Structures are given as C-alpha cells and as structure tokens.
C-alpha cells in the first residue's frame, strides 16, 4: 500500500436513499489522485466479486457496496447491470495511452493533434478518474448500444435511479451545453460521495509539472487537461 500523509478532510453527509453514511477519505495524496499506487495492496480497495463484473478488477470497497445495492434495485425492475471496467492506475492508463499514441504517429506525429484524438475517449495518465477506484464503466463501451433497445432502457434507468446510490453520469451529452472534455460516455458512472473529494483535491494540488513519464505528456498544459478534461464535471 502506498503510504500517504493525511492532507485533506471533508465533512460527513449522506447519499439520498442510501443506507450507508458517505465515506470520508482523510488520506488523499497527489500519488493517489494521479494513479501512482497499486490497488491490490491499497487498504481501501478490494477485488470486485465475480457476480458484479465481467473480468478481474479492483474498486474501492464503498463503491462495491453501493454498486451491489444498485444492481439489486435494477434487477427488481428488470434491468441487468454489470461492471466492465474499474480501477486503472497510472501504469495501466499509460499502456492504453501509449498504444494509441504509437498507432496514431503515422497520421498525426508526436503532436497535440495526436493527443487530442486520443482524448476523445481516453484520459492522459495522471488525469483519469479511473485512477481513483470510484468510477466504473457499465455494460457496454459503444455509444450506439445505449441509443436503442435494451441499452437505452438501461441508460434511462440509470439516469433516473443511479443518484439514489451515489452514482452520477460523468461525461454528459453535448446537448447539455458542455463544449469541453471527453466525448459523451453513457457507460461511465462515478461514485460521487468519494469522487467529489478527489476532484476537489486534484484541482487544488495537481499542476502540469505532475504530468510526466509517458509519451505526449508535454502537451498536457497546451491542451488544458486539468481545466477542460479533469475539471469539466462537478462530481
């Protein structure tokens, strides 16, 4: 487990219709919010039970509890929910980012345009909300899946009910007026009782000098990653 210094405390509150009190993380650190830790050895994390997910992954324990409650509620309404992606630390995100970076080199070169193309759906290492163990991808990663049929019903249920369990839709449709940040991701939901704490800490403590150690990191400031991608949502 990464040893962290207690640097931030947030007051308690409760999530609407959720029986558990809002978890408070009093040991948030720069290393944590930028993903430089191992979830499998972190005291707040656990492996997600197989009945909740499609593959082996880790999430924060509080997120697992809340998702199980949401999954059960959805099932009672005929809706099936399954986590298909959970925590990705810095090095996992780096692997995804650099694979795409190298694949785009022939077309875009080592340029900001290369980074911007990747940023449509993938975060720079050090800036992904998936670092925090609070954010999950549900059921399918295709925008078209949630536009019709079963996927649309699942999305409608989530938009109506997920907040009762602490989960919020992170990357809202462009029609909502959002012009910065990633493309809409109907599958991406965040456990806001914790993620709001990490987002607040991130905006107060992370600088562009913290973006290092991966291909294309030099473009983070020019592309306003902190302002236009990490900070694009309130939760």
Where are these regions (language model features)?
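Extracytoplasmic cell-surface/polysaccharide-interacting catalytic and binding patches
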Residues: 2-86, 90-235
């Amino acid at each position: 487990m990464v040893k962290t210094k207690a640097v931030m405390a947030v007051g308690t509150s409760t999530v609407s219709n959720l029986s558990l009190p809002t978890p408070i993380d009093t040991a948030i650190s720069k290393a944590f919010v930028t993903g430089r830790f191992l979830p499998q050895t972190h005291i707040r994390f656990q492996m997600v039970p197989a009945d909740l997910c499609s593959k082996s992954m880790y999430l924060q324990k509080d997120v697992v509890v809340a998702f199980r409650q949401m999954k059960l509620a959805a099932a009672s309404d005929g809706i099936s929910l399954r986590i298909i992606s959970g925590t990705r630390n810095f090095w996992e995100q780096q692997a995804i980012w650099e694979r795409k970076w190298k694949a785009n080199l022939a077309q875009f070169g080592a340029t900001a345009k290369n980074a911007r193309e990747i940023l449509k759906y993938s975060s720079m290492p050090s800036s992904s909300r998936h670092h925090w163990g609070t954010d999950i991808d549900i059921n399918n990663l295709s925008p078209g899946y949630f536009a019709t049929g079963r996927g649309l019903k699942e999305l409608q249920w989530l938009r109506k009910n997920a907040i009762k369990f602490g989960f919020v839709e992170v990357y809202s449709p462009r029609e909502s007026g959002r012009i910065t940040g990633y493309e809409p991701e109907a599958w991406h939901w965040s456990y806001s009782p914790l993620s709001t704490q990490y987002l607040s800490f991130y905006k107060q403590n992370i600088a562009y000098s913290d973006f290092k150690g991966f291909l294309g990191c030099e473009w983070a400031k020019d592309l306003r990653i902190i302002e236009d991608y990490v900070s694009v949502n309130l939760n």
